[in-house]
Amino acid sequence: MPVPTTNVGLSDIAAEFGGTVPHALSEYYNNGSAPASGTIRFSHLAGESAGISLKAYGKVIDTNTNSTSYSGSLSASVAVGDVIVIAKVTGFGDFAQGTTTINSISGTVLSFDNEWFSPIYGMMLFEKVTATASASSISVSCSEGSSNRQGMYVFAWLIGGGATHDDTAASASTGTLTVDTGENGAIVVGGSYTDDSYAIPDLNGADFETTFNRDMHVWAGHTVQSGTAATSSMTVATTGSDNRIWSFIKA
């Protein structure tokens, strides 16, 4: 909309950015953080209705059970257009990706890494889908073919607000991802799969981890950036580790 010279109201902002009543400035401003004083800029109007948000995250599957198929769910309010990202890790079995559906959708594989440390072998896979229907949970189903897996771990992130994949970094030892977030913010997610159970990576202080099948160690984490350019880095052990970090921004 053209910016008026006087008397800008929340109704004008709502007409530009959408949203639901009752309206509040924090609904739109800088990912929900309106200042108590000082200058308010239209370039900062990128909150819940105009920017992206991390709506939910957590473990969907975490088991050492031998099987060729696994399933699990995470309670979450999924809306049409939300992006669901998963980190999927297997133990033993074989190096194949298997078949994974997320809320009954076959997703896009972002990365696929094999891991081997005698006698352990498996893989780590990142995948994403865009929700085509609303749901009350994130449901993941994994079909692993004829070779038994001796364990499965899946971690999921739900990103709302019309996100798109922006960039990636991957390394056997260190991954560093730089994102120019502009005014819309960014969400960076990552995961690591290593035989060194003492090497817990860190992604800007947001850590979740579990010990997985015979000393294999799985880690998943995220950080939410807001308003300024930022660098997110993840460091893991150099021995037998796979790691990935991904950023998502407003489409």
What are these regions (language model features)?
Residues G51-A251:
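Primarily extracytoplasmic/secreted proteins
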Residues P2-S53:
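N-terminal low-complexity, intrinsically disordered "leader/linker" segments enriched in small/polar
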